[in-house]
Amino acid sequence: NWFIHNASMQKKLIISYIILVSIPLCILGIHSFSAANQNLLDQTEVTMDNNLHRMCQEADAIFQRETDFTKYLAYNLEFRQTLEGNAYNGSAIAQSLNKTVEPVFWYFITSDENLKMIKIVTPNTASDIGSFLESAEPYEDTVWYKKHEKDFNTEWTVEEDGKLYATRTILDTATTSRRIGVLRAEFYLNRILEPFDTMDYLDNGIVIKDGNGQVIYTKKIADEQMEQKIEAYIGENPEDASVLNKEYILKEASMEKVDWKIYYFIDRNTISEQIYS
C-alpha cells in the first residue's frame, strides 16, 4: 500500500529499477561468473588429461626404444656362443668381445643420448675383460643379480644411488633357459624424464613413483604447504589418487612400459588467477 499510495514518483522509479533491472543483472552476473568458472575448470581438467596422456606416451616410447636396445644386445648370438663355449677362456672371450660386442656397444653409447654405461656380468670369467665384461663374483649377493637368475625380462629400476638401470638376463643358446650373464645398462634419468620435466601448465606439480612406492621424481608447485598436503594425500591413496576438490586437481596414470605411477596436479588458486587476470 505504501508503494502504491504514498511513495513519491522518484522512489517508485528507484524501487522499480532495483527490482526490474538491478536484481536480475546481479543474478545474471553471478550465474555468468559461476558458469565461466565451471567452464574454465572443465577446460582445465580436459587439458590436464591430455597433458598426462601425452607425457606418458612420450616416456613410454623412450622406454620401449631402450628396452628393444637392451634386448638386441642381450640376444647377440655369436657372443653368447663364445661365452658359454669358452668359459674361463679369457683370450677367446676377448676376441669375441672385440669383434661382435664392443663396436656395437660403443656405437650405442655414442649415438644414444639417454645411455650412459653398459656392462655384462658373467660367472664364466674370473676377471674383467675389455671395457664391458666383468666377473659376476662381486655381484652375486646383489638384488638385481639374484633376481635375474629366473626373471628374463628387461627390468627398469631407480636404485638407492638415484641412478636408472635396465637389467636383462643373457641366456644360453641351446635352451634359452639358463643364465650365462646379465646385461646392465645405466641411463640418464633426467633425460628419460624430460617429457615430465618440461611440462609447464598453470605451475603444475608432478610426482612419479616406481613399483615399490619409492618417489623417483618430484616437480614442486609454488605453494609449499599445498605441495605437502597433496603429497600426503598421494601417500594415503596410492592406487586411486585422482581427485577434484576445492583446493587442487590431481590426476593419476600408470605407464605401460615400466611399473611407474604418475601423479599430476594443479593448485586451484592458479585457475582462479586466470579468471581475474
PLM segments and residue spans:
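Generic short beta-strand
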Residues: 118, 168, 205-208
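Solvent-exposed, extracytoplasmic
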Residues: 98-112, 178-223
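Extracellular/periplasmic juxtamembrane segments that couple receptor/chemosensory ectodomains to their
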Residues: 220-276
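Conserved beta-strands of PAS-like sensory domains
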Residues: 138-141, 160-199, 263-267
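Extracytoplasmic/periplasmic sensor domains and loops in membrane signaling proteins
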Residues: 92-105, 129-161, 202-203, 214, ...
